[in-house]
């Protein structure tokens, strides 16, 4: 996982692979982490899509970091705020 990547493959607890589209990545100085927001490509034609979020730490080369679950409500609140800002900006750009 690296910043700027467009698609990632997520492996669930059962070992099933799912190709996902990266919505965007961002860094938080407050939590000292990078985050990725993504959704399954199989849902992209649906009227509503479920957006997933994970944190990641790029390896020494700055690429292919491991995805980690979001750990705290404070992180979730920050991610929601960032997502809402992103979506508001997208709506403005469409007008």
From Swiss-Prot:
State the family named in the UniProt similarity comment for this chain.
Belongs to the UPF0473 family.
Query: A Pfam family name for this chain?
Result: DUF1292
Q: Which InterPro entries does this UniProt record tie to the protein?
A: UPF0473
Organism, as annotated = Bacillus pumilus (strain SAFR-032)
Please identify the protein, giving its name as recorded: UPF0473 protein BPUM_2377
């Amino acid at each position: 996982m690296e910043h700027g990547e467009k698609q990632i493959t997520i492996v669930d607890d059962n070992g099933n692979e799912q190709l996902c589209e990266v919505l965007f990545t961002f860094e938080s100085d407050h939590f000292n982490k990078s985050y990725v927001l993504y959704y399954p490509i199989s849902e992209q034609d649906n009227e509503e899509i479920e957006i997933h979020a994970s944190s990641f730490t790029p390896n020494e080369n700055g690429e292919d970091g491991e995805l980690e679950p979001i750990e705290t409500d404070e992180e979730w609140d920050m991610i929601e705020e960032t997502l809402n800002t992103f979506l508001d900006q997208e709506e403005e750009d469409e007008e």
